[in-house]
């Protein structure tokens, strides 16, 4: 068995162009990836175009922390063919976009009538990213989030706006806990407001090598060093699979 884990480039954010809001479009052209023989050991890693990605028996795509929204609901009792429509009805007021523009996916082992988490992603964007990989003969078996609501809490510090050939321009904190997931810049007061003080003692803290110094200064305590490739592999071990409903893998 061989596993290829691919990082989908973060979705372009809204930005101002001549006073108007615009969103850059088009799938990413280069991907960070890792390979593993068993999902545990990191074998190789790198960056390349889709057509140059290593071949593997299983392909897992990972979405960036900020590209997945999270909603806590009671799962409606609906037959499989109508479940997606039922979810859209429940979440209509909570979603920032029209329900038809959002891809929804249920948490593993979700049960009707019970509280569960629903992941929300831009449908057009995700469909375009999967299509770009498929065009290069890279067929994704599972799509997973980089982080998801969980206990105990996880705090991960990483560089932002980084050019691989140059320095990072800032540090972000990705905070996953029982009530959701948030990504905020370390600079300013929002990160302090987000994390309880003191943080739960069981919180698992980590940072990329380039963010360790800032993370430890902010926390006042050591953190585990976790390279981006290690975090990709960790995400791939989750039970989540966002390829549901109309984006389910066709075999």
Q: Where does each model-flagged region fall?
A:
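Hydrophobic/aromatic-enriched cytosolic interaction surfaces used to assemble or bind macromolecules
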Residues: 1-251
């Amino acid at each position: 068995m061989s596993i290829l884990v691919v990082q989908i480039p973060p979705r372009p954010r809204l930005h101002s162009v001549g006073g108007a809001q615009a969103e850059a479009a088009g799938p990413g052209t280069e991907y960070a990836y890792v390979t593993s023989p068993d999902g545990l050991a990191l074998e190789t890693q790198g960056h390349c175009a889709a057509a140059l990605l290593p071949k593997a028996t299983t392909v897992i795509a990972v979405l960036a922390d900020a590209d997945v929204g999270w909603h806590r609901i009671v799962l409606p009792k609906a037959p499989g063919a109508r479940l997606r429509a039922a979810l859209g009805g429940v979440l209509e007021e909570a979603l920032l976009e029209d329900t038809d523009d959002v891809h929804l996916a249920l948490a593993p082992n979700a049960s009707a009538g019970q509280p569960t988490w629903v992941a929300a992603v831009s449908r057009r964007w995700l469909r375009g990213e999967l299509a770009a990989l498929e065009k290069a003969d890279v067929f994704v078996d599972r799509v997973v989030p980089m982080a998801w609501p969980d206990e105990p809490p996880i705090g991960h510090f990483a560089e932002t706006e980084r050019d691989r050939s140059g320095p990072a321009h800032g540090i972000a904190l990705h905070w996953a806990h029982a009530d959701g997931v948030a990504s905020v810049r370390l600079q300013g007061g929002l990160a302090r407001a987000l994390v309880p003080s003191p943080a739960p003692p069981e919180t698992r803290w980590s940072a990329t090598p380039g963010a360790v110094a800032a993370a430890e200064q902010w926390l006042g305590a050591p953190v585990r060093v976790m390279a981006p490739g290690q975090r990709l592999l960790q995400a791939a071990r989750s039970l989540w699979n966002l390829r549901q409903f109309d984006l389910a893998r066709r075999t």
